[in-house]
UniProtKB/Swiss-Prot annotation:
Pfam family, one: SSB
Protein's name in the database: Single-stranded DNA-binding protein 1
The protein's assembly and partners: Homotetramer.
Tagged with keyword DNA-binding: yes
Record organism: Streptococcus pyogenes serotype M6 (strain ATCC BAA-946 / MGAS10394)
Gene: ssb1
HAMAP family: SSB (MF_00984)
Annotated ranges, domain SSB: 1-103
């Protein structure tokens, strides 16, 4: 049997580092991953994947990632259950074993400042052209 998850998407929110009762660091995050097809309205839908990151990997992720960061994750699919008010709840999430940020610092800064590479907004008059 083989349990492997690879996903590429954007962080829904900035991940937060939490320390457990046993002094271990954990970060929980949601990764928005676009589907390969468009719906009947012509829009692309996304799945929101729950991801858990432990230890030094969690510390590193929290230090460098922010809301909207494009990243890939590699891990295993896990299902856990817990009891709340007498009802058993099941949670399926990805246990992240590695990640990679897929945008440069410059791309991240442009995204965070809402700057795009869209040349449509750029208007040059003939007098300003160097030729």
């Amino acid at each position: 049997m083989y349990n492997k998850v690879i996903a590429i998407g954007r962080l829904v929110a900035k991940p937060e580092l939490v320390k457990t009762a046993t002094d271990k660091h954990v970060a929980r995050l949601s990764l928005a991953v676009n589907r390969r097809f468009k719906n009947a309205s012509g829009e692309r839908e996304a799945d929101f994947i729950s991801v858990v990151v432990w230890g030094k990997l969690a510390e590193t992720l929290v230090s460098y990632a922010s809301k909207g960061s494009l990243m890939s994750i590699d891990g295993e699919l896990r299902t856990r259950k817990y009891d709340k008010d007498g009802q058993v709840h099941y949670v399926t999430e990805v246990l992240c074993q590695s990640f990679q940020l897929l945008e440069s610092r410059a791309q991240r800064a442009m995204r965070e400042n809402n700057v795009t590479n869209d040349l449509v907004d750029l208007v040059l008059e003939e007098d300003t052209l160097p030729f």
